[in-house]
Amino acid sequence: MTIIRVKENEPFEVAMRRFKRTIEKNGLLTELRAREFYEKPTAERKRKKAAAVKRHYKRIRSQTLPKKLY
């Protein structure tokens, strides 16, 4: 559970920004979105494998030298 103590004479917007930052850091929003709807285990594995392949190709693309354009 995320608790934010509002300091004296602190504007609401600043406190809200701190709250959002801590929630983002904890990963609560991503977990909430993932648990919003049930995802079958096979669909979850398929999604994670596709993400891993995408990361792999992205890493390879960043490591290779660009072709010379003549």
Swiss-Prot record:
Pfam families: Ribosomal_S21. Keywords: Ribonucleoprotein, Ribosomal protein. Disulfide bonds: none annotated. InterPro entries: Ribosomal_bS21, Ribosomal_bS21_sf. One of its GO terms (cellular component) is ribonucleoprotein complex. One of its GO terms (molecular function) is structural constituent of ribosome. GO terms for biological process: translation. Belongs to the bacterial ribosomal protein bS21 family. NCBIfam families: S21p. This is Small ribosomal subunit protein bS21A. It comes from Burkholderia orbicola (strain AU 1054).
